Protein backbone atom coordinates (compact mmCIF):
# COMPACT_ATOMS: atom_id res chain seq x y z
CA UNK A 1 0.00 0.00 0.00
CA UNK A 2 1.26 3.48 -0.86
CA UNK A 3 1.05 5.96 2.00
CA UNK A 4 3.06 8.66 3.76
CA UNK A 5 3.80 9.55 7.38
CA UNK A 6 3.23 12.99 8.88
CA UNK A 7 5.43 13.74 11.92
CA UNK A 8 4.23 16.96 13.56
CA UNK A 9 7.38 18.85 14.60
CA UNK A 10 6.81 22.60 14.39
CA UNK A 11 6.03 23.41 18.05
CA UNK A 12 8.19 24.82 20.82
CA UNK A 13 8.00 21.92 23.29
CA UNK A 14 7.17 24.17 26.25
CA UNK A 15 6.21 21.25 28.51
CA UNK A 16 9.86 20.18 28.43
CA UNK A 17 10.85 23.58 29.82
CA UNK A 18 14.53 24.32 29.17
CA UNK A 19 15.32 20.92 27.63
CA UNK A 20 14.22 22.12 24.18
CA UNK A 21 16.14 25.38 24.45
CA UNK A 22 18.70 24.45 21.78
CA UNK A 23 16.95 21.75 19.74
CA UNK A 24 13.46 20.89 18.60
CA UNK A 25 11.84 18.46 21.03
CA UNK A 26 11.99 15.79 18.29
CA UNK A 27 15.74 15.61 19.07
CA UNK A 28 15.43 15.10 22.82
CA UNK A 29 17.78 12.20 23.59
CA UNK A 30 16.44 8.79 24.58
CA UNK A 31 19.33 6.38 25.28
CA UNK A 32 21.61 8.60 23.15
CA UNK A 33 19.23 8.59 20.18
CA UNK A 34 16.78 11.38 19.29
CA UNK A 35 13.11 10.62 19.92
CA UNK A 36 12.24 11.09 16.24
CA UNK A 37 14.56 8.21 15.28
CA UNK A 38 12.37 5.77 17.19
CA UNK A 39 9.50 6.91 14.94
CA UNK A 40 11.37 6.94 11.62
CA UNK A 41 12.82 3.48 12.16
CA UNK A 42 9.34 1.98 12.58
CA UNK A 43 8.76 2.33 8.84
CA UNK A 44 10.25 0.76 5.70
CA UNK A 45 12.88 2.72 3.78
CA UNK A 46 10.53 3.49 0.88
CA UNK A 47 7.98 5.36 3.05
CA UNK A 48 8.07 9.14 2.60
CA UNK A 49 7.90 11.40 5.65
CA UNK A 50 6.20 14.79 5.56
CA UNK A 51 7.46 16.91 8.45
CA UNK A 52 6.12 20.38 9.28
CA UNK A 53 8.94 22.32 10.96
CA UNK A 54 9.14 25.69 12.67
CA UNK A 55 10.98 25.96 15.99
CA UNK A 56 14.66 25.02 15.57
CA UNK A 57 13.77 23.70 12.11
CA UNK A 58 17.38 23.34 10.94
CA UNK A 59 18.22 20.94 13.75
CA UNK A 60 15.57 18.47 12.53
CA UNK A 61 16.43 18.90 8.86
CA UNK A 62 20.15 18.47 9.45
CA UNK A 63 19.79 15.48 11.74
CA UNK A 64 17.42 13.50 9.52
CA UNK A 65 19.25 14.18 6.25
CA UNK A 66 22.62 13.30 7.82
CA UNK A 67 21.40 10.17 9.60
CA UNK A 68 19.08 8.76 6.94
CA UNK A 69 20.49 9.72 3.51
CA UNK A 70 18.55 6.92 1.77
CA UNK A 71 15.14 7.95 3.12
CA UNK A 72 12.84 10.59 1.65
CA UNK A 73 11.85 13.57 3.80
CA UNK A 74 9.66 16.46 2.71
CA UNK A 75 10.09 19.36 5.12
CA UNK A 76 7.31 21.93 5.21
CA UNK A 77 8.36 25.27 6.70
CA UNK A 78 5.56 26.55 8.92
CA UNK A 79 5.49 30.35 8.99
CA UNK A 80 3.37 30.59 12.14
CA UNK A 81 4.37 28.18 14.90
CA UNK A 82 3.97 30.34 18.00
CA UNK A 83 1.66 33.10 19.14
CA UNK A 84 -1.82 34.05 17.97
CA UNK A 85 -3.11 32.00 15.05
CA UNK A 86 -0.62 29.20 15.52
CA UNK A 87 -1.46 25.68 16.59
CA UNK A 88 -1.02 22.02 15.76
CA UNK A 89 -3.91 22.17 13.30
CA UNK A 90 -2.36 25.10 11.46
CA UNK A 91 0.92 23.21 11.07
CA UNK A 92 -0.88 20.09 9.85
CA UNK A 93 -2.87 22.02 7.23
CA UNK A 94 0.34 23.43 5.74
CA UNK A 95 1.08 19.85 4.66
CA UNK A 96 -2.20 19.17 2.83
CA UNK A 97 -0.81 19.32 -0.71
CA UNK A 98 1.82 16.70 0.17
CA UNK A 99 -0.74 14.32 1.69
CA UNK A 100 -3.29 13.62 -1.01
CA UNK A 101 -3.34 9.93 -0.18
CA UNK A 102 -3.86 7.84 2.97
CA UNK A 103 -1.33 8.75 5.65
CA UNK A 104 -0.30 8.13 9.22
CA UNK A 105 -0.24 11.02 11.66
CA UNK A 106 2.11 10.96 14.62
CA UNK A 107 3.31 13.54 17.06
CA UNK A 108 7.10 13.71 17.43
CA UNK A 109 6.92 12.78 21.12
CA UNK A 110 5.21 9.40 20.70
CA UNK A 111 7.23 6.17 20.88
CA UNK A 112 5.59 2.74 20.62
CA UNK A 113 7.04 -0.75 20.82
CA UNK A 114 4.70 -2.50 18.39
CA UNK A 115 4.77 -2.33 14.60
CA UNK A 116 2.59 0.45 13.20
CA UNK A 117 -0.06 -0.78 10.76
CA UNK A 118 -0.57 0.95 7.38
CA UNK A 119 -3.63 3.24 7.00
CA UNK A 120 -5.74 0.69 5.11
CA UNK A 121 -8.60 1.94 7.28
CA UNK A 122 -9.08 4.75 9.77
CA UNK A 123 -7.54 3.90 13.14
CA UNK A 124 -6.38 5.63 16.33
CA UNK A 125 -3.73 4.45 18.77
CA UNK A 126 -4.46 4.22 22.47
CA UNK A 127 -2.73 3.01 25.63
CA UNK A 128 -3.53 2.14 29.22
CA UNK A 129 -2.34 4.93 31.53
CA UNK A 130 -2.56 5.58 35.24
CA UNK A 131 -3.65 9.18 34.67
CA UNK A 132 -5.58 10.28 31.58
CA UNK A 133 -6.07 13.86 32.76
CA UNK A 134 -3.41 15.45 30.55
CA UNK A 135 -4.30 13.52 27.39
CA UNK A 136 -7.24 13.39 25.00
CA UNK A 137 -8.94 10.03 25.27
CA UNK A 138 -11.07 7.57 23.32
CA UNK A 139 -14.38 6.04 24.30
CA UNK A 140 -14.53 2.60 22.76
CA UNK A 141 -17.53 0.34 22.17
CA UNK A 142 -17.63 -2.91 20.22
CA UNK A 143 -14.09 -2.40 18.92
CA UNK A 144 -14.90 1.00 17.48
CA UNK A 145 -14.08 4.54 18.57
CA UNK A 146 -17.41 6.17 19.41
CA UNK A 147 -16.08 9.40 20.92
CA UNK A 148 -12.84 11.40 20.94
CA UNK A 149 -12.88 13.08 24.35
CA UNK A 150 -11.20 16.24 25.57
CA UNK A 151 -8.55 16.13 28.29
CA UNK A 152 -9.85 15.14 31.71
CA UNK A 153 -12.69 12.91 30.49
CA UNK A 154 -14.08 10.51 33.09
CA UNK A 155 -15.40 6.98 32.87
CA UNK A 156 -14.11 4.08 30.80
CA UNK A 157 -11.82 5.90 28.40
CA UNK A 158 -8.36 5.15 26.98
CA UNK A 159 -5.58 7.67 26.45
CA UNK A 160 -5.12 8.71 22.82
CA UNK A 161 -1.40 8.64 22.07
CA UNK A 162 -1.14 11.06 19.14
CA UNK A 163 -0.83 8.28 16.55
CA UNK A 164 -3.49 7.62 13.91
CA UNK A 165 -4.06 6.12 10.48
CA UNK A 166 -6.11 8.31 8.15
CA UNK A 167 -7.58 6.42 5.20
CA UNK A 168 -10.36 8.88 4.36
CA UNK A 169 -7.92 11.72 3.82
CA UNK A 170 -10.23 13.84 1.63
CA UNK A 171 -12.90 14.01 4.34
CA UNK A 172 -10.22 14.69 6.94
CA UNK A 173 -8.82 17.68 5.04
CA UNK A 174 -12.29 19.02 4.28
CA UNK A 175 -13.28 19.03 7.95
CA UNK A 176 -9.96 20.52 9.08
CA UNK A 177 -10.43 23.45 6.69
CA UNK A 178 -14.11 23.89 7.50
CA UNK A 179 -13.29 23.96 11.20
CA UNK A 180 -10.74 26.78 11.17
CA UNK A 181 -13.10 29.01 13.15
CA UNK A 182 -14.43 26.14 15.27
CA UNK A 183 -11.16 24.92 16.80
CA UNK A 184 -9.31 22.82 14.22
CA UNK A 185 -6.22 25.06 14.41
CA UNK A 186 -5.83 24.64 18.18
CA UNK A 187 -7.14 21.07 18.55
CA UNK A 188 -5.15 19.53 15.71
CA UNK A 189 -5.70 16.17 14.03
CA UNK A 190 -8.29 15.10 16.63
CA UNK A 191 -10.68 17.68 15.20
CA UNK A 192 -10.67 16.13 11.73
CA UNK A 193 -10.71 12.59 13.10
CA UNK A 194 -13.97 13.27 14.98
CA UNK A 195 -15.76 13.54 11.64
CA UNK A 196 -14.43 10.14 10.57
CA UNK A 197 -16.12 8.33 13.46
CA UNK A 198 -19.23 7.77 11.34
CA UNK A 199 -17.03 6.03 8.77
CA UNK A 200 -15.59 3.85 11.55
CA UNK A 201 -12.31 4.29 13.39
CA UNK A 202 -10.57 1.19 14.68
CA UNK A 203 -8.99 1.54 18.15
CA UNK A 204 -5.47 0.07 18.12
CA UNK A 205 -3.67 -0.66 21.42
CA UNK A 206 0.02 0.18 21.82
CA UNK A 207 2.74 0.01 24.45
CA UNK A 208 3.34 3.75 24.59
CA UNK A 209 6.17 5.94 25.79
CA UNK A 210 5.62 9.70 25.91
CA UNK A 211 8.54 12.14 25.60
CA UNK A 212 6.52 15.36 25.65
CA UNK A 213 6.71 16.28 29.33
CA UNK A 214 9.37 16.01 32.03
CA UNK A 215 7.78 13.24 34.11
CA UNK A 216 6.93 11.03 31.13
CA UNK A 217 10.35 11.63 29.57
CA UNK A 218 12.10 10.40 32.71
CA UNK A 219 10.08 7.15 32.60
CA UNK A 220 10.83 6.71 28.91
CA UNK A 221 14.55 7.27 29.40
CA UNK A 222 14.61 4.80 32.27
CA UNK A 223 13.05 2.11 30.07
CA UNK A 224 15.40 2.64 27.12
CA UNK A 225 18.59 3.53 28.99
CA UNK A 226 20.30 0.17 28.47
CA UNK A 227 19.95 0.25 24.69
CA UNK A 228 23.42 1.74 24.21
CA UNK A 229 26.66 0.92 26.00
CA UNK A 230 28.01 4.42 26.64
CA UNK A 231 28.45 6.75 29.60
CA UNK A 232 27.87 10.22 28.22
CA UNK A 233 27.00 12.97 30.66
CA UNK A 234 24.25 15.17 29.29
CA UNK A 235 25.03 18.77 28.34
CA UNK A 236 22.65 21.56 27.47
CA UNK A 237 24.48 22.74 24.35
CA UNK A 238 25.95 19.48 23.01
CA UNK A 239 24.83 15.93 22.28
CA UNK A 240 26.16 12.67 20.88
CA UNK A 241 23.66 10.41 19.14
CA UNK A 242 24.05 6.81 17.98
CA UNK A 243 21.86 5.95 15.00
CA UNK A 244 21.93 3.62 12.02
CA UNK A 245 25.49 2.42 12.85
CA UNK A 246 26.61 6.04 12.72
CA UNK A 247 27.57 8.62 15.35
CA UNK A 248 26.23 12.17 15.16
CA UNK A 249 27.84 14.97 17.17
CA UNK A 250 25.67 18.07 17.76
CA UNK A 251 26.66 21.48 19.11
CA UNK A 252 24.88 24.82 19.16
CA UNK A 253 28.28 26.39 18.42
CA UNK A 254 28.76 26.40 14.64
CA UNK A 255 32.43 27.40 14.96
CA UNK A 256 32.95 24.41 17.26
CA UNK A 257 31.63 22.01 14.61
CA UNK A 258 33.58 23.65 11.79
CA UNK A 259 36.82 23.49 13.79
CA UNK A 260 36.20 19.88 14.85
CA UNK A 261 35.80 18.83 11.23
CA UNK A 262 39.00 20.66 10.23
CA UNK A 263 41.00 19.21 13.15
CA UNK A 264 39.89 15.68 12.31
CA UNK A 265 42.06 16.00 9.20
CA UNK A 266 45.05 17.11 11.30
CA UNK A 267 44.82 13.98 13.46
CA UNK A 268 43.63 11.59 10.76
CA UNK A 269 44.33 7.94 11.54
CA UNK A 270 43.85 8.45 15.28
CA UNK A 271 40.19 9.60 15.15
CA UNK A 272 37.16 8.47 13.10
CA UNK A 273 36.82 9.79 9.56
CA UNK A 274 34.03 12.37 9.32
CA UNK A 275 31.71 11.37 6.48
CA UNK A 276 29.46 14.43 6.34
CA UNK A 277 28.65 17.56 8.29
CA UNK A 278 26.32 20.56 8.58
CA UNK A 279 26.76 23.81 10.48
CA UNK A 280 25.68 22.22 13.80
CA UNK A 281 26.47 18.52 13.31
CA UNK A 282 28.95 16.06 11.92
CA UNK A 283 28.65 12.33 11.32
CA UNK A 284 31.07 9.42 11.28
CA UNK A 285 30.80 5.66 11.06
CA UNK A 286 30.45 3.91 14.40
CA UNK A 287 33.73 2.16 15.22
CA UNK A 288 33.51 -1.43 16.43
CA UNK A 289 35.14 -1.73 19.82
CA UNK A 290 34.78 -1.10 23.53
CA UNK A 291 35.32 2.14 25.40
CA UNK A 292 38.36 1.94 27.67
CA UNK A 293 36.26 2.85 30.71
CA UNK A 294 34.24 -0.37 30.53
CA UNK A 295 37.09 -2.64 31.56
CA UNK A 296 40.26 -0.65 32.31
CA UNK A 297 43.41 -2.54 33.25
CA UNK A 298 47.00 -1.67 34.02
CA UNK A 299 48.31 -3.72 31.09
CA UNK A 300 46.04 -2.00 28.55
CA UNK A 301 46.77 1.40 30.09
CA UNK A 302 50.52 0.82 29.71
CA UNK A 303 50.01 -0.17 26.08
CA UNK A 304 47.86 2.91 25.52
CA UNK A 305 50.49 5.29 26.93
CA UNK A 306 53.12 3.73 24.66
CA UNK A 307 50.77 4.19 21.69
CA UNK A 308 50.07 7.81 22.64
CA UNK A 309 53.78 8.59 22.46
CA UNK A 310 53.39 8.07 18.71
CA UNK A 311 50.55 10.60 18.77
CA UNK A 312 52.18 13.24 20.99
CA UNK A 313 54.63 14.48 18.35
CA UNK A 314 56.40 17.58 19.66
CA UNK A 315 56.17 20.75 17.60
CA UNK A 316 59.35 22.78 17.13
CA UNK A 317 58.65 26.49 17.68
CA UNK A 318 60.73 29.57 16.98
CA UNK A 319 61.15 32.33 19.60
CA UNK A 320 58.07 34.26 18.53
CA UNK A 321 55.92 31.12 18.39
CA UNK A 322 57.16 30.10 21.85
CA UNK A 323 56.12 33.45 23.29
CA UNK A 324 52.75 33.29 21.54
CA UNK A 325 52.20 29.73 22.78
CA UNK A 326 52.97 30.74 26.36
CA UNK A 327 50.42 33.56 26.11
CA UNK A 328 47.85 31.14 24.70
CA UNK A 329 48.50 28.75 27.62
CA UNK A 330 48.21 31.57 30.15
CA UNK A 331 44.89 32.67 28.72
CA UNK A 332 43.64 29.09 28.36
CA UNK A 333 44.52 28.10 31.92
CA UNK A 334 44.38 31.26 34.03
CA UNK A 335 41.89 33.60 32.36
CA UNK A 336 39.45 30.83 31.48
CA UNK A 337 39.57 29.42 35.01
CA UNK A 338 38.73 32.75 36.65
CA UNK A 339 35.91 33.23 34.14
CA UNK A 340 34.49 29.73 34.65
CA UNK A 341 34.59 29.99 38.44
CA UNK A 342 32.61 33.24 38.25
CA UNK A 343 30.19 31.49 35.90
CA UNK A 344 29.80 28.66 38.42
CA UNK A 345 28.97 31.08 41.23
CA UNK A 346 26.36 32.80 39.06
CA UNK A 347 24.79 29.63 37.67
CA UNK A 348 24.44 27.83 40.99
CA UNK A 349 23.93 30.92 43.18
CA UNK A 350 27.03 30.27 45.29
CA UNK A 351 29.45 32.74 46.88
CA UNK A 352 33.21 32.66 47.37
CA UNK A 353 33.99 32.11 51.03
CA UNK A 354 36.11 30.14 53.47
CA UNK A 355 34.61 26.67 53.79
CA UNK A 356 35.08 23.48 55.71
CA UNK A 357 35.41 20.74 53.09
CA UNK A 358 35.47 17.17 54.39
CA UNK A 359 36.48 18.51 57.81
CA UNK A 360 39.29 20.79 56.61
CA UNK A 361 39.07 24.60 56.66
CA UNK A 362 39.90 25.90 53.19
CA UNK A 363 40.30 29.54 52.03
CA UNK A 364 38.32 31.28 49.32
CA UNK A 365 38.82 29.81 45.86
CA UNK A 366 40.08 33.08 44.38
CA UNK A 367 42.69 33.29 47.16
CA UNK A 368 43.87 29.79 46.20
CA UNK A 369 43.96 30.66 42.51
CA UNK A 370 46.04 33.76 43.27
CA UNK A 371 48.70 31.54 44.89
CA UNK A 372 49.29 29.47 41.74
CA UNK A 373 52.56 29.98 39.87
CA UNK A 374 50.80 30.75 36.58
CA UNK A 375 54.12 31.35 34.83
CA UNK A 376 55.03 27.73 35.44
CA UNK A 377 51.59 26.48 34.43
CA UNK A 378 51.76 28.48 31.18
CA UNK A 379 55.14 26.98 30.28
CA UNK A 380 53.58 24.27 28.10
CA UNK A 381 55.03 21.60 25.85
CA UNK A 382 53.66 22.00 22.29
CA UNK A 383 52.56 18.68 20.76
CA UNK A 384 49.87 17.18 18.57
CA UNK A 385 47.11 16.98 21.18
CA UNK A 386 43.69 15.43 21.76
CA UNK A 387 42.22 17.86 24.28
CA UNK A 388 39.64 15.71 26.08
CA UNK A 389 41.59 12.59 26.83
CA UNK A 390 39.70 10.39 29.27
CA UNK A 391 38.66 6.74 29.15
CA UNK A 392 35.17 7.44 27.73
CA UNK A 393 36.89 8.98 24.71
CA UNK A 394 39.28 6.10 24.10
CA UNK A 395 38.01 3.15 22.11
CA UNK A 396 39.75 -0.22 22.15
CA UNK A 397 39.25 -1.38 18.57
CA UNK A 398 37.97 -4.88 17.86
CA UNK A 399 39.09 -4.74 14.22
CA UNK A 400 41.48 -2.82 11.99
CA UNK A 401 45.20 -2.07 12.20
CA UNK A 402 45.15 0.49 15.01
CA UNK A 403 44.63 -0.78 18.58
CA UNK A 404 42.82 2.40 19.67
CA UNK A 405 40.61 5.17 18.31
CA UNK A 406 40.38 8.57 20.00
CA UNK A 407 36.89 10.09 20.21
CA UNK A 408 35.46 13.56 20.88
CA UNK A 409 38.70 15.43 20.29
CA UNK A 410 38.96 19.10 21.21
CA UNK A 411 38.43 21.51 18.30
CA UNK A 412 41.38 23.75 19.22
CA UNK A 413 43.72 24.76 22.02
CA UNK A 414 43.10 28.41 22.73
CA UNK A 415 42.56 28.99 19.01
CA UNK A 416 45.49 26.81 17.89
CA UNK A 417 44.61 23.74 15.81
CA UNK A 418 47.97 22.22 14.92
CA UNK A 419 49.34 21.88 18.44
CA UNK A 420 48.49 22.27 22.11
CA UNK A 421 49.99 21.57 25.53
CA UNK A 422 50.78 17.95 26.37
CA UNK A 423 50.13 18.75 30.03
CA UNK A 424 46.50 19.44 29.20
CA UNK A 425 46.16 15.91 27.81
CA UNK A 426 47.91 14.57 30.92
CA UNK A 427 45.55 16.46 33.23
CA UNK A 428 42.47 15.37 31.28
CA UNK A 429 43.60 11.76 31.49
CA UNK A 430 44.29 12.14 35.20
CA UNK A 431 40.89 13.73 35.91
CA UNK A 432 39.17 10.72 34.31
CA UNK A 433 41.17 8.31 36.45
CA UNK A 434 39.83 10.02 39.56
CA UNK A 435 36.21 10.59 38.47
CA UNK A 436 34.46 7.77 36.58
CA UNK A 437 31.67 8.95 34.25
CA UNK A 438 30.06 5.52 34.56
CA UNK A 439 29.76 5.79 38.34
CA UNK A 440 28.61 9.41 38.17
CA UNK A 441 25.93 8.38 35.66
CA UNK A 442 24.74 5.85 38.25
CA UNK A 443 24.64 8.61 40.92
CA UNK A 444 27.27 6.85 43.02
CA UNK A 445 28.37 10.06 44.69
CA UNK A 446 27.09 12.44 47.35
CA UNK A 447 27.50 16.10 48.22
CA UNK A 448 26.07 17.62 51.39
CA UNK A 449 26.19 21.37 51.88
CA UNK A 450 25.11 23.16 55.04
CA UNK A 451 26.07 26.83 55.17
CA UNK A 452 29.87 26.84 54.75
CA UNK A 453 30.34 23.16 55.63
CA UNK A 454 30.61 20.67 52.78
CA UNK A 455 31.03 16.93 52.73
CA UNK A 456 31.51 15.02 49.49
CA UNK A 457 32.27 11.43 48.64
CA UNK A 458 32.31 9.38 45.45
CA UNK A 459 32.87 5.78 44.50
CA UNK A 460 36.03 4.84 42.62
CA UNK A 461 37.00 1.72 40.71
CA UNK A 462 40.04 -0.05 42.13
CA UNK A 463 41.54 -0.62 38.69
CA UNK A 464 41.34 3.13 37.98
CA UNK A 465 43.10 3.82 41.28
CA UNK A 466 45.84 1.42 40.18
CA UNK A 467 46.06 3.15 36.79
CA UNK A 468 46.39 6.51 38.55
CA UNK A 469 49.30 5.21 40.64
CA UNK A 470 51.00 3.86 37.51
CA UNK A 471 50.38 7.12 35.64
CA UNK A 472 52.21 9.04 38.38
CA UNK A 473 55.18 6.68 38.03
CA UNK A 474 55.11 6.95 34.23
CA UNK A 475 55.08 10.76 34.31
CA UNK A 476 57.96 10.92 36.77
CA UNK A 477 60.00 8.35 34.83
CA UNK A 478 59.50 10.45 31.69
CA UNK A 479 60.63 13.50 33.72
CA UNK A 480 57.31 15.33 33.51
CA UNK A 481 56.15 17.53 36.41
CA UNK A 482 53.55 15.51 38.33
CA UNK A 483 52.69 18.39 40.67
CA UNK A 484 51.86 20.50 37.63
CA UNK A 485 49.59 17.72 36.33
CA UNK A 486 47.80 17.59 39.69
CA UNK A 487 47.38 21.37 39.73
CA UNK A 488 45.94 21.35 36.23
CA UNK A 489 43.64 18.45 37.13
CA UNK A 490 42.20 20.57 39.95
CA UNK A 491 41.77 23.44 37.49
CA UNK A 492 39.87 21.15 35.11
CA UNK A 493 37.38 20.24 37.85
CA UNK A 494 36.87 23.93 38.64
CA UNK A 495 36.43 24.74 34.95
CA UNK A 496 33.86 22.06 34.15
CA UNK A 497 31.82 22.54 37.34
CA UNK A 498 29.94 25.40 35.68
CA UNK A 499 29.02 23.20 32.71
CA UNK A 500 27.44 20.22 34.45
CA UNK A 501 24.19 19.53 36.26
CA UNK A 502 23.50 20.00 39.96
CA UNK A 503 24.59 18.35 42.30
CA UNK A 504 27.42 16.88 40.18
CA UNK A 505 28.55 20.48 39.67
CA UNK A 506 29.07 20.84 43.43
CA UNK A 507 31.16 17.67 43.58
CA UNK A 508 33.40 18.92 40.77
CA UNK A 509 33.86 22.34 42.32
CA UNK A 510 34.65 21.15 45.83
CA UNK A 511 36.88 18.32 44.63
CA UNK A 512 38.85 20.86 42.59
CA UNK A 513 39.03 23.32 45.47
CA UNK A 514 40.13 20.62 47.91
CA UNK A 515 42.84 19.36 45.52
CA UNK A 516 44.12 22.88 44.94
CA UNK A 517 44.38 23.55 48.67
CA UNK A 518 46.62 20.49 49.09
CA UNK A 519 48.92 21.61 46.26
CA UNK A 520 49.37 25.37 46.69
Describe the residue ranges of each PLM region.
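Active-site activation/catalytic loop segments of kinase-like enzymes and analogous catalytic loops
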Residues: 412-473, 490-504
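Conserved kinase catalytic-core helix
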Residues: 265-271, 291-356, 362-378, 385
Amino acid sequence: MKYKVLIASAGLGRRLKGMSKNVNKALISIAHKPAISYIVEKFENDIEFVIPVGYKADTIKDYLTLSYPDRKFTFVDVDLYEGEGSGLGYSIMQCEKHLQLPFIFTSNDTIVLEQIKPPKNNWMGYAQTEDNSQYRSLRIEKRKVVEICSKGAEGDVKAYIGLAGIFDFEDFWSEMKNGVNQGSIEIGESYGLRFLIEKDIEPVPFTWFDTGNIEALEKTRKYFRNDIDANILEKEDEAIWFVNEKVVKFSVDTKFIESRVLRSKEISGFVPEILSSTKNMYLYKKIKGEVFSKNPSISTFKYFLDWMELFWIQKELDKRQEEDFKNVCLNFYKDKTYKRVKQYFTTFEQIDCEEIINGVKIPKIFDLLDKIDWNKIANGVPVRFHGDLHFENILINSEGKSPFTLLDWRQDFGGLQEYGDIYYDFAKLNHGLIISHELIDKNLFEVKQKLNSIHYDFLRKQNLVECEIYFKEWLENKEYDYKKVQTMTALIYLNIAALHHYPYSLLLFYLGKNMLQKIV
